Amino acid sequence: MIPLVSSLLIVPTQFELECLSPTFREEIGQTDCHLELCGFGIVVSGLRTSHLIAQHSPKQVLLIGIVGTLDGRFSVGQAVQFDRVTCFGIGAGSGHLSLSADEMGWRQWPTEPVISDSILLRESSCDEQTPYPANLLTCCSASASDQDVRLRLEKHPNAVAEDMEGFAVAAACRFAGIPLTIIRGISNRAGDRNKDNWRVSEAMLAVEKKIRKVLGL
């Protein structure tokens, strides 16, 4: 029988997992928390999270990893705990003509727990480290140019960063009735696909620091 865990920590990719320090992984291994991969992108990450929740019955889920900053309100190398996650790219059309599911008059799930284009994770908690409400935009495909970023901000001016898993993981947690915390490190400017410019190690160390605080390690 698989033991129950108090906290399920999930990370999308093996690359991000390997960027976690050995010390941090050892600390997690000495607790009743469990660290797992959830997979890359908005489809697999949601399905895998549902499977992991059924397998481990955690009291809470924490999604960690890297994201790209959309507008510079949060700096590269900083870790952010997000207040809300919003879906981008599911609906109709593209570019300036795109419509979200909500704009089309649909809900992504129509009955309790109702899931629309945006899922609240926690009431906004602004402080010196997080001076703005932190809305994460989950995209089916990451920005590849400044034009992509501009189009996303035109539709979602309150979004501060983009990822490809947060909304799917949040939906899985909503269905399971389990609270989700998303803490991800800003590794790069969204639209910059030159990984030589990315500061992944710094971003993941910042994530570790925040996770330790949340879990009381």
Indicate residue ranges for each PLM-predicted region.
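Conserved beta-strand elements of the Class I
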Residues: S6-I10, L62, V80
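Mid-sequence, gly/pro-rich, charge-dense loop/helix-turn segments that line enzyme active sites
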Residues: L70-P157
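Regulatory input/activation interfaces that engage signals or partners
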Residues: N158, I178-L180, G185-L217
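N-terminal short beta-loop-beta anion/metal-coordinating cradle
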Residues: M1-S57, F74
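Short glycine-/acidic-enriched loop or helix-start segments at secondary-structure transitions
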Residues: E18-S21, D71-F74, G91, D192-R193
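A C-terminal functional module that forms or caps the active site or interfaces directly
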Residues: C140-I182, S187-D192
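Conserved acidic residues
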Residues: K59-V61, A159-V160
